[in-house]
Amino acid sequence: IAISALSQLACSSSPTAQETTNHPQTDLVKPINGTWINLAYQDVRNKYTNPQHFDNTDPHLWSQKVEELSQMGVEYLVFMAVANEEKSFYPSKLMTWAYPANRKSPVDAIMDKAAEKKMKVFMSTGWAKDQDDNLRDPEIKQRQLDMMKELANLYGNHPALYGWYLPVEDCLCPLLSEHAVVSVNAL
């Protein structure tokens, strides 16, 4: 009887002024408003998002995905990479395309839908070769510079472009390594 009375009291009582106006824990929760786009997905362990199980270069798939992300409130998109293993996901003149030549590139599909939805995109400038790009290698460094110029020419004035992302990351252990700083500054 006591438990029943307490539950009835708890359910029928009005919230206090503090309960209705002050939610310190929920005030700290911020929505996710950005996400990564990973066209060159390498992790074959994940059977649901592994490109072996669907056409990861389909422009309609990416247009729909950007539409969905926009509806969820996502404002920022960051391309992880726009090329991998010397194949591009954009109309490159430097390398073979990773998508059929008779259709729109995945990068163009994403950029155009993002512009339509007023989203902001950080364009990746890699990978010159693959995810292990070593910018100390003169050939990879030159390829990276060529890609950066090509991407700037193709997308530098695109309405969805918000910034650039160099996907050659290094450890902050506790500081960036000297070769990482030198490589980025050289680019």
Residue ranges, per PLM feature:
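Bacterial N-terminal signal peptides
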Residues: 1-8
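Glycan-processing catalytic domains of CAZymes
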Residues: 19-187
